[in-house]
């Protein structure tokens, strides 16, 4: 066998990933992965096609091999610009995620004596029976409490059209803005940060920045494990360019520190002080790009002491001077300089516990006009009671130096889910959003949506709906009666399970529906479980962290009676007549809708249903099945996408025509005249920036980005004498989120079967604990028992423990506090107080 240099690199990367996970590759020996990259050599009886990876927000493309109606193999797509033929260890086992032994294939309803009972046993029912019960529960709840009595909790793992259909069904059909995605728990702070600074969501740069940068700074991001393919590109850049630097900031050491030139372990929440110190250093050393800020920036000061997103009755929430306030007032550059001046090197070193020389080295990197810097961050910034502020403050640094919107330079918010950008954010499945950065609170935005959707004026309610944490509180308080969860496992992933989540789900007054392929913690706590099609069992589309939209075709059928989330929403919409859910005065504005169902109005409206099945056959060939399209009799996905795309075209969110994406390995929006945009807001790269403008942040009416003065403020809950340690939660390389897919892959489960608690050896010795012992981790809200680990990949400093959240047998969110960023409503999973004792 002859190996090219490319094959050799790929094979070694695969072997490295497998070694890290302590598993064997699906093809043995390791070189076999390189040897079978070309599908033509893998056997004529296997059919291959492309798909976006099912896991993180990187957006890798994989080749999917099918045979006999099953996915039998997956491999990295050598034509994909994102991953260039590589997979991480999870990607190598994608072929197994759909075939767990406990896959759900029929709807299951809690029943006793032949009818629904909240305390009954799960019993198989037909889809008609399931929808009959759902219909009765929805209509009863809405008759008594109006549209605000029902809610839907979606996902950054929804396909683009699943999220879009759900948004239409809830916000236009049922007229309820109680729709939120699980991306509220991971990306909401990034969204609000973008909107406050630029008034336009998502990164201005792209992954091409990696090959052009002189330095990388990771803020609360363990890319080595959470975005390993991007990390491989950073590693290549660092090791092949001797002057390249990597700086890593975190509250504990992890695998990304192994490549770091500058390691900064800071005290929880003090990243805010570090960010302000860097801004102060830039100003004090004369490193401000004065021309840039004079032309392209405006200065603001934000309200402070804004609380912690806790219940209004909580003492810390009651004590806040400006609870939940995002108000900003204009200031001058001189006032901004005075604001950050107290954040000296000495003060910041003392506050953060980071050695002064390391802080100074980091600040000098940003201040050096010759160094091109990319800042990456994920949950360390976002899952933070001041997560929006943290996002704003890192933008301040890049704006002060002009290191933004240019190749190799820029702030880059990474996403954790495959379509947190493409579905949750761009489609607008948040409780306050509509597609393309429109919001329900703005009457002009509502009018745009109503016109595109052919709805009477006043259909979309103007009040923001309940966000993720508020939904759980409303269920517990019996204000929310029906809750439909799709494509996530919130009973495991949501915060404060014991006090806020489980009581609401098992409240006798609530009805909980969970659509899932497996019997997850969420499914087992529900009243009705709907079996769901997964990944390539349906036609899909995701949008990744670099604004890249990617499509795939349905390649196999779902098992049994499992149906996609899209099918479920569209089919259920047939159960509602317009008159049943709209007030009479609204129906009177569109009398032609009288007697029609929500399906007729939303999905058979002359736009969504205008693409015929023969059009699908021409595009894909008859070899490809499409369950949803065959069921409704038209090319549903194409109709939904083209209607949705109308929101963004001509407004800086331009998407290409639907058919283009099936031919490409994704395109980065805005796509204008068939050309994708790599760097936004910069003349010569962005078609929306006119000749002579240089830079224009066109999301803002004046074209100027906001540099915002915001202080360091403490966390919601800090260690004390009894609960004397910080708890930080997160992930590991081998598992994804709650492990509902990866723990069903035997190789990944064997590699890391259980969650452990990582602790500094000195902390263990102080408590009389030893590595390998069973210990209890206890917070004010609950306790769990785990094995103690004082070595290995994660190395917390004294005073902090780390626990991953993938293990349904050790629910770490029994411990966490439901504090949120008051602006983004995103949960802070990184900071609460615990104690650790022998079990």
Curated annotation (Swiss-Prot):
Mo-bis(molybdopterin guanine dinucleotide) binds at residues 90, 157, 182, 186, 219-226, 250-254, 269-271, 379, 383, 489, 515-516, 538, 565, 729-738, 813, 830. Predicted to be exported by the Tat system. The position of the signal peptide cleavage has not been experimentally proven. Substrate binds at residue 805. PROSITE patterns: 4FE4S_MOW_BIS_MGD, TAT. The gene is napA. One of its GO terms (molecular function) is molybdopterin cofactor binding. Its cofactor is [4Fe-4S] cluster; Mo-bis(molybdopterin guanine dinucleotide). It catalyses: 2 Fe(II)-[cytochrome] + nitrate + 2 H(+) = 2 Fe(III)-[cytochrome] + nitrite + H2O. This is Periplasmic nitrate reductase. CDD domains: MopB_CT_Nitrate-R-NapA-like, MopB_Nitrate-R-NapA-like. It is found in: Periplasm. One of its GO terms (biological process) is Mo-molybdopterin cofactor biosynthetic process. Residues 46-102 form the 4Fe-4S Mo/W bis-MGD-type domain.
């Amino acid at each position: 066998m002859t190996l090219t240099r490319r094959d050799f690199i790929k094979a070694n990367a695969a072997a490295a990933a497998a070694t890290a996970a302590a598993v064997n590759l699906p093809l043995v020996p390791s070189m076999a992965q390189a040897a079978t990259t070309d599908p033509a050599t893998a056997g004529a009886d296997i059919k291959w096609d492309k798909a976006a990876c099912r896991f993180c927000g990187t957006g890798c493309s994989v080749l999917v091999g099918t045979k006999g109606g099953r996915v039998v193999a997956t491999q990295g797509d050598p034509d994909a610009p994102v991953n260039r033929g590589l997979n991480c260890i999870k990607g190598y086992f994608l072929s197994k995620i759909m075939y767990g032994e406990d896959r759900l294939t029929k709807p299951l309803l809690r029943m006793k004596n032949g009818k629904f009972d909240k305390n009954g046993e799960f019993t198989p029912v037909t889809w008609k029976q399931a929808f009959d019960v759902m219909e009765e529960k929805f209509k009863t709840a809405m008759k008594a409490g109006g549209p605000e009595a029902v809610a839907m909790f979606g996902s950054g793992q929804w396909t683009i059209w699943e999220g879009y259909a759900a948004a239409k069904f809830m916000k236009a059909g049922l007229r309820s803005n109680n729709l939120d995605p699980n991306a509220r728990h991971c990306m909401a702070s990034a969204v609000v940060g973008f909107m406050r600074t630029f008034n336009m969501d998502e990164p201005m740069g792209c992954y091409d920045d990696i090959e052009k940068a002189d330095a990388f700074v990771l803020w609360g991001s363990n890319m080595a494990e959470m975005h390993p393919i991007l990390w491989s590109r950073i590693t290549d850049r660092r090791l092949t360019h001797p002057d390249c630097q990597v700086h890593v900031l975190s509250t504990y050491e992890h695998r990304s520190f192994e490549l770091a030139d500058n390691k900064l372990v800071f005290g929880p929440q003090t990243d805010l002080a570090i960010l302000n110190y860097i801004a102060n250093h830039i100003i004090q050393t004369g490193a401000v790009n004065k021309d840039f800020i004079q032309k392209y920036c405006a200065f603001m000061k934000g309200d402070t002491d804004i609380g912690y997103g806790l219940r209004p009755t909580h003492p810390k929430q009651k004590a806040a001077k400006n609870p939940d306030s995002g108000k900003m007032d204009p200031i001058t550059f001189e006032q901004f300089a005075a604001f950050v001046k107290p954040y000296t090197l000495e003060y910041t070193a003392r506050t953060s516990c980071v050695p002064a020389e390391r802080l100074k080295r980091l600040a000098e990197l940003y201040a050096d006009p010759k160094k091109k810097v990319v800042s990456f961050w994920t949950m360390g910034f976002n899952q933070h009671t001041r997560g929006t502020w943290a996002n704003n403050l890192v933008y301040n640094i890049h704006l002060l130096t002009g290191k933004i919107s240019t190749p190799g330079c820029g702030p880059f918010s990474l996403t954790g889910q495959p379509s947190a950008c493409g579905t949750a954010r761009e489609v607008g499945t948040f409780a306050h959003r509509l597609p393309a950065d429109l919001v329900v609170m703005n009457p002009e935005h509502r009018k745009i949506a109503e016109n595109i959707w052919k709805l009477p004026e006043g259909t979309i309610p103007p009040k923001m709906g309940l966000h993720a944490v508020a939904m759980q509180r409303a269920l517990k308080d019996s204000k929310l009666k029906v809750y439909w969860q799709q494509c996530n496992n919130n009973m495991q992933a949501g915060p404060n399970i014991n006090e806020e989540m489980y009581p609401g789900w098992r409240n006798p007054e609530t009805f909980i529906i969970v659509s899932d392929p497996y019997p997850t913690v969420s499914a087992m706590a529900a009243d009705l479980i709907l079996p769901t099609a997964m990944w390539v069992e349906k036609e899909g589309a995701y949008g990744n962290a670099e604004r890249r939209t990617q499509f795939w075709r349905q390649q196999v059928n779902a098992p049994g009676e499992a149906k996609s989330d899209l099918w479920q929403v569209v089919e259920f919409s047939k159960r509602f007549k317009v008159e049943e859910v709209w007030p009479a005065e609204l129906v009177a504005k569109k009398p032609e809708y009288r007697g029609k169902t929500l399906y007729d109005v939303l999905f058979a409206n002359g736009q969504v249903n205008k693409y015929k099945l023969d059009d699908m056959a021409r595009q894909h060939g008859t070899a490809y099945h499409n369950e949803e399209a065959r069921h409704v009799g038209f090319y549903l996905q194409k109709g939904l996408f083209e209607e949705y795309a109308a929101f963004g075209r001509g407004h800086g969110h331009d998407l290409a025509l639907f058919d283009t994406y099936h031919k490409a390995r994704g395109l980065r929006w805005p796509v204008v005249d068939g050309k994708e945009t790599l760097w936004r807001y910069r003349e010569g790269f962005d078609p929306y920036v006119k000749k002579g403008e240089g830079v224009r942040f066109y999301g803002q009416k004046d074209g100027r980005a906001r540099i915002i003065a915001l202080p360091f403020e403490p966390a919601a809950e800090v260690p004390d004498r009894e609960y004397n340690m910080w708890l930080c939660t997160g992930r590991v390389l081998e598992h994804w989120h709650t492990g509902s897919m990866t723990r069903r892959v035997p190789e990944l489960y064997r590699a890391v079967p259980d969650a452990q608690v990582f602790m500094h050896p000195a902390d263990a010795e102080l408590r009389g604990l030893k590595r390998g012992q069973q210990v209890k981790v206890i917070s004010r809200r609950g306790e769990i028992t785990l094995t103690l680990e004082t070595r290995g990949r994660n190395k917390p400093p004294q005073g902090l423990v780390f626990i991953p959240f993938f293990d349904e047998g050790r629910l770490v969110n029994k411990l966490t506090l439901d504090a949120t960023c008051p602006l983004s409503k995103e949960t802070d999973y990184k900071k609460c107080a615990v104690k650790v004792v022998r079990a």
